[in-house]
Amino acid sequence: MQKTLKRYFPIFVLPTLIAFSFAFIIPFVMGVYLSFCKFKTITNAQFVGLENYIKIFADKDFVNAFGFTLKFSVVSIVTINVFAFILALALTRKIKGTNLFRTVFFMPNLIGGIILGYIWQQMINAVLLKYETTLVANPTYGFWGLVILMNWQMIGYMMIIYVAGLQNVPTDLIEAAEIDGATSLQTLFKVKIPMVMPSITICLFLTVSNSFKLFDQNLALTAGAPSKKTAMLALDIYNTFYGRNGYEGVGQAKAVLFFIVVAVIALGQLVLTRRKEVEQ
């Protein structure tokens, strides 16, 4: 049986490998090459070396977008995971209606980013108009509007992962801690959190990557206004590639650099958190 599987393994893998190559590997390699070119279309690409990458660091919009994205990501990662974990703790207690609450908290994650952006734009502006201002009048309003939107969308999803982790904590350990006289806080920090580190690793990875890659919510909520001060990296790349004539190569270079930054940060976070995981 094993010999038969090994014999036909390439036949089953080959279609997937071909599809993956055409859908990801070839476009990725082509994208990296085009980041070193000046082009209108891929048929008239002219190699210009590092010129596009030099222009990136002279672009104030990119520098501002990078700083804004970094600040937004730090705040979102902390708030999403803290609130999601608190909700998970509450919903793993023996209270009525936990399944209903889990469903309600998870539902915002099912709504598209563009729709969420416009919904929250209307809601926040309805409040701000009472004070004779709008969401795009001040970068601070746009920043916190994006944070609120991101939290509302992601907390329910992260909560489900934390709930699964908390439910897998051995009850023997919790009972042993209680017998030893540990308080609720001591049990939380010494038993539960170390045991749910795999869930924390997953949630941190997802929030890090999603925070940095945020695009459609940013486009719908503020579109970078005022004066591109609330534009995040993904939106800045879009504006450069499609909105600035002759800057297609620069936009592609920004996309490659963006991929490297997100990959390094996400992989670094995975390494750091996995070191703290406890074998069960």
Residues covered by each model-derived region:
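A structural signal for multi-pass alpha-helical bundles of membrane permease subunits
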Residues: Q2-Q280
